[in-house]
Amino acid sequence: MATNKFFKSLLFTLTIAISSFGFCVENSSAYPVFAQQGYSNPRAANGKLACANCHLNQKAIEIEAPQGVLPNSVFEIEIKVPYDVNRQQISADGKPADLNVGGILILPKGFKLASKTQISPEVKAKNKGVFISPYSTEFDNILVVGPIAGKTHQELIFPVVAPDPENNPDVKYLTYPFYAGGNRGRGQVYPTGERSNINSFGATQGGQITEITTTEKGESKITIVNSDGATTSQTLSAGLKLLVKQGDIVKQDQPLNIDPNVGGFGQEESEIVLQSSSRILGYLAFCFCLLLTQVLLVLKKKQYEKVQAAELNF
């Protein structure tokens, strides 16, 4: 167990370092790899992916994958994470920033990330600067990527190599389900359980707002006095746009700021067939026999019609 935890921590550190080297991403919480630290398996029994625990807003994604693959073949699974590239999010320091994207792909056991020598030059060019890693040493069939710049990577391409049932007895020629998730933007909850500044914050008590001040860091300090004269102060993070002003009467839990969340997480599932080349050849041979039989029947019919015509003429 201790060895597995060490490798998970090491893999997490390397992923962060290489991703940061590839892209200068400012104060992002769009790390699918954060799930590696808190979840041994990112997919719960009910099918929910761990990423949805931090990215509370739902946004659609799309999956593009071949319907069937042959053993030892290399193919691509593409996760599309669309969003309006003109929109910006609030970074951790309250400044506007472009959205980042991340993705997770849960493949059937036996399927795994293709090696560099197996990846085509076209895919290498598309994935330049993108680091895809296995979820852990235990689950090399689960791949994660991110955070990466969303403007240039709304399509996440995962090069995958199919297993060979001849070499792996646990793999059969079957139809397998696989699962994908993709997020854009920062999450609303940190892995520690704390809320990020990508949230709508409610009043801690009802009453009148007697004062709103701005701190040196750009934070908004709101003072509320209730009907009993009790005073509370709330500090909202910099960059949040207030919905209230001094003198307003608010109820408890009433939103004090506009919801700044412009991102979200989505998950989808699909199927892929691991096909046997011998079965495909057998099917083609069967189709050829059917075609040949049909041709012979047509020729025989024409021959019979000629014989009948000759007898009538006679």
UniProtKB/Swiss-Prot annotation:
It comes from the Eukaryota. Gene3D superfamilies: 2.40.50.100, Cytochrome f large domain, Single helix bin. It is found in: Plastid, Chloroplast thylakoid membrane. Keywords: Chloroplast, Electron transport, Heme, Iron, Membrane, Metal-binding, Photosynthesis, Plastid, Signal, Thylakoid, Transmembrane, Transmembrane helix, Transport. GO terms for cellular component: chloroplast thylakoid membrane. It holds the Pfam family Apocytochr_F_N. GO terms for molecular function: electron transfer activity; heme binding; iron ion binding. The chain crosses the membrane at residues 280-300. Belongs to the cytochrome f family. The 4 large subunits of the cytochrome b6-f complex are cytochrome b6, subunit IV (17 kDa polypeptide, petD), cytochrome f and the Rieske protein, while the 4 small subunits are PetG, PetL, PetM and PetN. The complex functions as a dimer. This is Cytochrome f. The lineage of its organism: Eukaryota, Sar, Stramenopiles, Ochrophyta, Bacillariophyta. The gene is petA.
